[in-house]
Amino acid sequence: MWGGRCSPSTSSRHRASLLQLLLAALLAAGARASGEYCHGWLDAQGVWRIGFQCPERFDGGDATICCGSCALRYCCSSAEARLDQGGCDNDRQQGVGEPGRTDREGPDSSAVPIYVPFLIVGSVFVAFIILGSLVAACCCRCLRPKQDPQQSRAPGANRLMETIPMIPSASTSRGSSSRQSSTAASSSSSANSGARAPPTRSQTNCCLPEGTMNNVYVNMPTNFSVLNCQQATQIVPHQGQYLHTPYVGYAVQHDSVPMTPVPPFMDGLQPGYRPVQPPFAHTNSEQKMFPAVTV
């Protein structure tokens, strides 16, 4: 009765043995995968050989060490034949990264200097400043108001024109009123000429019309004396431009100034000198001669 049945202890033992076998297989696989990696290299013919993980498929489980030379590499189990791959210089393909080798960089790989970005940004900033300055200078030159060439060429002429008022072209109505005022002034001057003679004119106003100096005070600059009679008549305005029409006919009364006799000059600063006699003889009884005074 008991011989046909399996005890629970027997079944547990079988399960334990299966687990042990599975663990052994896993450990063997881990030991197989824990070997060294032989990096790729260039052989003597210049052909690139791809790297591999030790042990390979045809090697034994204990061949976990990369052995050989830099030009020929293989897997072995002898620690004395181990290859120092760090001293080889042909284990790097140009332009291709080698898996498992992060300690060495390719010959073509060059690090970018840290100052290059700052140099680029500074160059752009300086170029922007220069371009802005040029644009501002062009805008200021284009928008600047242009100076009148006549004003800049003849500043003295403008001052002369301000000093000497120009005679505008008179209209027909102004011409008729000026003719009436001139006739009235000439009649009044002829009426006053019988009673009193006009004062002697200087050479400067020799060409002025009759009644101009008697009725109107004209402020004439000194540089008008060099002008001839024709130019003087063109420059001096008509009397109707300075006086209103109701006051043109009135003449300015000129009073005669009596001549005062000139006393003889006497030099009293130095002693012993006689008084200076005038060049002409005086017949007036009011004049007296004073003797020289000695100090």
UniProtKB/Swiss-Prot annotation:
- Any ranges marked Extracellular in the topology annotation, and which? 34-110
Q: Name one GO cellular component term.
A: endoplasmic reticulum
- Could you tell me which Pfam families the record lists for this protein? Shisa_N (PF13908)
Q: Which key words are in the record? A: Developmental protein, Endoplasmic reticulum, Membrane, Signal, Transmembrane, Transmembrane helix
Q: Where is this region: Disordered?
A: 87-108, 168-204
Where is the protein localized?
Endoplasmic reticulum membrane
How does the protein's chain sit in the membrane according to the entry? Answer: Single-pass type I membrane protein
Provide the phenotype resulting from gene inactivation.
Answer: Mice exhibit no defects in head development. Mice are live-born. About one-third of the homozygous mutants were normal and fertile and about two-thirds were dwarf. Reduction in weight gain became apparent at the postnatal third week; about half of the dwarf mice subsequently resumed the weight increase, although they remained dwarf; the other died within a month after birth.
Compositional bias of kind Low complexity: 169-197
Q: Which family does it belong to?
A: Belongs to the shisa family.
| Role summary | Plays an essential role in the maturation of presomitic mesoderm cells by individual attenuation of both FGF and WNT signaling.
Q: What is this protein called?
A: Protein shisa-2 homolog
Its taxonomic placement starts with: Eukaryota, Metazoa, Chordata, Craniata, Vertebrata
- Gene name of this polypeptide: Shisa2
